[in-house]
Amino acid sequence: MSDEEHHFESKADAGASKTFPQQAGTIRKNGYIVIKNRPCKVMEVSTSKTGKHGHAKCHFVGIDIFNGKKLEDIVPSSHNCDVPHVNRTDYQLIDISEDGFVSLLTETGNTKDDLRLPTDENLLSQIKDGFAEGKDLVVSVMSAMGEERICSLKDIGPKN
């Protein structure tokens, strides 16, 4: 055994699964589901009765949490669906670069520089205007299935 120290900086999620299985019949409105390989928030669920040939079916209508597109899927209620691990994290906004990336302060005091400004015009203008006015802004970043996007903004007062 050597006395050397080994330092690892984790940039990956250690191969953890981006989704978990859940029975279709137990997924409810406002939950999450993967439809056509996209993480979606469930807006509507309707269940059809068991037919002559087989299972009751669940009809899901979801909105992609990153691009806002409406997606639909029909799954037998006894089958498993993929449900994305969705995380929401708040970061303080430090800077906006000219190429459209933001610089964010993490809880540990490090910076996160790999996120683009949001494409939503309303949110984009709120962030740019608030930053230009020198306000202290906190952005919420939603992450699921290897994607991250700024989804909301909080003003925590003027900078001192």
Swiss-Prot record:
GO terms for biological process: positive regulation of translational elongation; positive regulation of translational termination. Belongs to the eIF-5A family. This is Eukaryotic translation initiation factor 5A. GO terms for molecular function: ribosome binding; RNA binding; translation elongation factor activity; translation initiation factor activity. The modification Hypusine is found at K52. Residues 1-21 are annotated as: Disordered. Keywords: Hypusine, Initiation factor, Protein biosynthesis. NCBIfam families: eIF_5A. Residues 1-12 have a biased composition (Basic and acidic residues). It comes from Manihot esculenta (Cassava). Translation factor that promotes translation elongation and termination, particularly upon ribosome stalling at specific amino acid sequence contexts. Binds between the exit (E) and peptidyl (P) site of the ribosome and promotes rescue of stalled ribosome: specifically required for efficient translation of polyproline-containing peptides as well as other motifs that stall the ribosome. Acts as a ribosome quality control (RQC) cofactor by joining the RQC complex to facilitate peptidyl transfer during CAT tailing step. It holds the Pfam family eIF-5a. SMART domains: eIF-5a.
